[in-house]
Amino acid sequence: MSRILLTGFEPFGGEKVNPSELAVKQLEGKTIAGLEVVAGVLPVVTVKCIDEAVKLIEKYEPVAVLNVGQAGGRVELSIEKVAINVKDYRIPDNEGNQIRYAPVVEGGPDAYFATIPVEKIADSLVEKVIPASVSYTAGTYCCNEVFYGVSHYLRNNKPGVLNGFIHIPFILEQAAGAKPPRASMPLEVIVKGLEIAVEVVAEGLEK
């Protein structure tokens, strides 16, 4: 059976949980639209985040890769269109590195577009009454770094493998009692949204 790799991240920035980790773990081992879901958790550490993602790709040999990350402040699922070759951390990573104005890959292309059907995923989520839209900025932190690094690796080593990135909001337990108030989404809605995204990716693979 063909596999799709979903990755989340460990908690960072003082948070006790990372909803991306929780969400991908809930889908791990399931079969969705004929694809076996395999999953992994990436460190929020420059370079190591890409290295771990590549190890998972080489281990599982998926037909598609969907990286997922927390974006506090977003109010919906953001289906990312483009990864840029920039690292500019507003906060340190989990090993204290605060990279400024550096490339993800020295000499690499300025950007990579997602190869999953970004617009169709966003439209399908909205049709299923899950707030979502296409996003044109994945930031300049570890999420974008992984999105770019995975894109670069796949284009150069496994060009037939589809990939993309989805940013998700905080979950309720991160928002309850927060000052100032935080936007949030129930974890079960996020999980359902990712399941729909996998279904759309699977449809694209069949064509």
From Swiss-Prot:
GO cellular component terms, semicolon-separated: cytosol
Alphabetical list of SUPFAM superfamilies matching this protein: Pyrrolidone carboxyl peptidase (pyroglutamate aminopeptidase)
Q: Which GO terms describe its biological process?
A: proteolysis
Query: What Enzyme Commission number(s) does the record list for this chain?
Result: 3.4.19.3
Alphabetical UniProt keywords: Cytoplasm, Hydrolase, Protease, Thiol protease
Please write the reaction equations for the catalytic activity of this protein: Release of an N-terminal pyroglutamyl group from a polypeptide, the second amino acid generally not being Pro
Q: What does this protein do?
A: Removes 5-oxoproline from various penultimate amino acid residues except L-proline.
- This chain belongs to which protein, by name? Pyrrolidone-carboxylate peptidase
Q: Which organism is it from?
A: Coprothermobacter proteolyticus (strain ATCC 35245 / DSM 5265 / OCM 4 / BT)
